[in-house]
Amino acid sequence: MPWFKNLIKISKTITNQSSSYKSITPLASPLLAQFLQFTKQYSTNDHVVGLEATKSDQKPRIVVLGSGWAGCRLMKDIDTNIYDVVCVSPRNHMVFTPLLASTCVGTLEFRSVAEPIGRIQPAVSTQPASYFFLANCNAIDFDNHMIQCQTVTEGVETLEPWKFNVSYDKLVIASGAHALTFGIKGVNEHATFLREVHHAQEIRRKLLLNLMLSDVPGVSEEEKRRLLHCVVVGGGPTGVEFSGELSDFILKDVHQRYAHVKDYIHVTLIEANEILSSFDDRLRVYATNQLTKSGVRLVRGLVQHVQPDKIILSDGTNVPYGLLVWSTGVGPSPFVNSLDIPKAKGRIGIDEWLRVPSVQDVYSIGDCSGFLESTGRQVLPALAQVAERQGKYLASLLNKVGKEGGGHANCAQNINLGDPFVYKHLGSMATIGRYKALVDLRESKEAKGVSLAGFTSFFVWRSAYLTRVVSWRNKIYVLINWLTTLVFGRDISRI
């Protein structure tokens, strides 16, 4: 984009010059002049470029931090006739996480589970005052309605990251959560998580590389067994689904295409307690039996230390591995921890209308937020359906506020917000491989409801997620991938 090139050029040339708003008004357009405002707050240099506060005759600006389920659903439903939208995120797409495990073994292509932000909300690509910024938010000045960001330039060796500020009328913090490591030494250095597309790409590369290397002359029997030992830590839905996909891949594809090493590859799933603890007891027993039949070894234990080639359990057992996937749940990110606002179990504290009550014009949704104790509500689980429904509700609320003239900063105090957010759990689903899945339609663990397992559940699982895929483009991608995998097998190319 031309304006972005101008931003890069200007940010480099003004470091040692005295600048003001007047010095940039002759540039490309009034809009560019608005964007290239110089502020001295937060900056380690003399100046920081950024978006200035909106004026009363302009549309109010909503700034969304994050591009996950919550933030993307909000951006999809927000009325861009009322608001300008600015999204700040280190990734330019939304990940359809329920199908991410399928991409690790070639059942689906990576593009099938990634939806570009510009397709979810076209305004950020087409409207003159709406933007997507590839950046991280480092700090928030709640008093002055401003965020400090730093660009993500990873992979561009010729460009150093720089800071910029964005003023907001309404701020929505939907920055998600980070994988929990429980402070275990070696996890971040040696394990692979499964939360992003690049995680799935890394898992696939490692898996296929280990398969090919183990087939090369000169590799000892012991080293073959280590290279082809896939260890999954965490018995939640993600860990179980990945184990199921991996066992399918081994039984159907490795046995055909890597016949020389098929007897060496195996999967171990390590969980401290019961797998799928939120599911019905009968479904857990069924999943345990099916995974065992598929060759997945279930181990109950606690990881104490992770080394480059093995993990050490709390009882002293050494478990060699060639691929280690870590899926033990999520917790607050360093960014959320850095915010000086009330928290709820480590998350950003919100009220019944998803507002951050300690500051003006700030909302929080998704995995990074939780109801304050004063609301009398429990902190909701970190689930996609929770985040998506919060995004839908908040978009409706902000559209209502904007229509009633409360879109600008500090203008919504006297507006009736209507009914508070209410969450009703629709159930849980998980695939366990071999065309079998679990469907638990209970509203809670203690409630009664329908529980299904087997091929029928697998059909329900696939149908449900196919309908939930964001765009028709990706729906078609997913359907075609499933059909080609069924007919021709999984893609085992290492690119």
From Swiss-Prot:
Residues 1-41 form a transit peptide. Binds 1 FAD per subunit. One of its GO terms (molecular function) is NADPH dehydrogenase activity. It is a peripheral membrane protein. InterPro entries: FAD/NAD-bd_sf (IPR036188), FAD/NAD-binding_dom (IPR023753), NDH-2 (IPR045024), NDH2-like_C (IPR054585). It is found in: Mitochondrion inner membrane; Peroxisome. SUPFAM superfamilies: FAD/NAD(P)-binding domain (SSF51905). FAD binds at residues 61-91. The keyword NAD applies. GO terms for cellular component: mitochondrial inner membrane; mitochondrial matrix; mitochondrion; peroxisome. A motif (Microbody targeting signal) lies at residues 486-495. It catalyses: a quinone + NADH + H(+) = a quinol + NAD(+); a ubiquinone + NADH + H(+) = a ubiquinol + NAD(+). Its cofactor is FAD. Keywords: FAD, Flavoprotein, Membrane, Mitochondrion, Mitochondrion inner membrane, NAD, NADP, Oxidoreductase, Peroxisome, Transit peptide. Its EC number is 1.6.5.9. NAD(+) binds at residues 228-264. It holds the Pfam family NDH2_C. Alternative NADH-ubiquinone oxidoreductase which catalyzes the oxidation of mitochondrial NADH does not translocate protons across the inner mitochondrial membrane. Belongs to the NADH dehydrogenase family. This is Internal alternative NAD(P)H-ubiquinone oxidoreductase A1, mitochondrial. It comes from Solanum tuberosum. The gene is NDA1.
